[in-house]
Amino acid sequence: MENGTDELWHQFAYPFGPHPDGAVGLCAACRRLGHCRLGLLAEELDDSGGMRAPIRVPIDAEGGPGVAHGGWTAAALDEVLGHTLVLHGHFAVTGTLTVRFVKPVPIDRDVMGTARIVGHEGHRWSISGELTLATTGALLASAEGVWVERGTDHFDRARSWAAEQDAMTGPEPSA
């Protein structure tokens, strides 16, 4: 493994489309853990093409007493919205993400992530979604964003760019 990458990413073996058992498609770091560290438990497309994902808010997402850090909330929404395209068989990366925080998200509780595609033009997909409390449906946060479809060489290009940046810095200055 080099710079956080592994052979699965190098070969781009990411699973696209819905899993027959509703399992969550895991990123490289979560594959090593064997579960989604953001707490996604399952994911499925509904009859209208929208995505539903039950989530257990992890205790280690705690920011303030008993509530999730806003960064966790944004990351969970990014994952739910992005996985909507994965379940439809598209690889895209987040271009923009705007999050509206409505209520504090309680830790160690079940929430529901939902998302839907609201537009598509060229390589850009507009998606919106929300997190709600699973027990009551109370809105906790919502998001909208644009995802940009990429080819399977996306991560190779990212590594090349990072190597170019590293080459530009030269040796560390001495004290």
Regions found by a protein language model. Name each.
Residues A23, C36, G49-A53, V93-L97, ...:
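A generic structural signal for short beta-strands and their flanking turns/coil linkers
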Residues E43-L45, R116-H120:
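Short beta-strand micro-motifs enriched in acidic
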Residues A53-I55, L97-F101, A115, G129, ...:
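A structural signal for short, well-ordered beta-strand segments
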